[in-house]
Amino acid sequence: MKGMCKMKKKAALHNLGCKVNAYETEAMQELLEQNGYEIVPFKEGADVYIINTCTVTNVADRKSRQMLHKARKMNPDAVVVATGCYVQARGEDIDPCVDIVVGNNKKKDLIAILDEYYNAQHKVKKELLDINHEKEYEEMQVTHTAEHTRAYIKVQDGCNQFCSYCIIPYARGRVRSRNLEHVLEEVRTLAASGYKEVVLTGIHLSSYGIDTGESLLELIQKVHEIDGIKRIRLGSLEPRIITEEFASSIAVLPKMCPHFHLSLQSGCNATLKRMNRRYSAEEYMEKCDLLRKYFHNPALTTDVIVGFPGETQEEFAESMDFVDRVNFYETHIFKYSRRAGTKAAVMPDQIPEEIKSERSAKMIELGHRKQKAYEERLLGTTQEVLMEEAVETEDGIYQVGHTKEYVKIGLKTEENLSNQLKNVKIEDTKQIIH
């Protein structure tokens, strides 16, 4: 048996944060399985607890700390491993309940780090690199995922943007793109295992290839050629990648899902400038218009921050008006979270929490109205749905999956349709699941 363990040890993992983190957690789980560990649910007793942390907001920091303490409380004798963005950004300031700290570019070495820890008679172990100088992509691979129909594939790490509110470039380092052929190998493996949809994801997906002379468009076109894959979906994109060439080129690919998450953050130019977002609201709207030019009724989704430092009532109203005019399918609202070490953290005119909450509630209500309007346009249409699971409701059993636009749809039947593509006529709003 590989690895350090003579007896089969139990390991439990918990993921916090984005799809990139989720991918890395699944890759670490595979490493543990390959080296003789038994994977158990986090709520069960384990010999090793691994928490992949997040630091995107203060709430994420708090949840990360809570999970680390929960692991220690569940088994005081267990090895508690902290990895991910929270520990990378915090450096040496890590809670004493943690036995091992693994930086964001050392996750592939998890087994060796555990071996060394045990061989060193349980001395506290820290594996943190100065990630800002890291130039190599950390190659990890997933052959199966928690979902049995859709697989997320990490193709890129790091970010060079340095938006004034964001701590992630400090936790993830500069842009590093995965070898294109390695991505294709993983897609082929997943296709052979029966996965029908792949989602290309990264910390700053739009930057894929800027360090290797390749491009995201080239990667999409290569993935499209792989047999077995029926759908290609993209993670969050920067608006600037949506050019006439990009939109027209992906629109001719039958497997391409017309679901685009374009980060907005604010619809007010003055706020965007303070955020260092590098585009105007007008430019953003042009990108949305381009996508609607080449795709029929695409689902456009976004993120919006309310209560950014200096955001006046007039600026907020301008942002609300812009979101209203874009007609997003989904709008994810975040109250500005002050992150130490960022430019925004020391900006004047910080907004009180009660005002942030008021603005958040208004933006959420607007988002819900826009989502309802988009969904109502689907009534009477027939949509291709990738079935994923059975859901029991008061109205009976529904087989549930997602359209290419990522609208969750139910078909009332007891027949198991998991991982099948079915054309479903949407006759009632009850079929649209939230």
Protein language model regions, located:
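Short flexible coil/turn linkers enriched for glycine and charged/polar residues
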Residues: 146-149, 159-160, 256, 266, ...
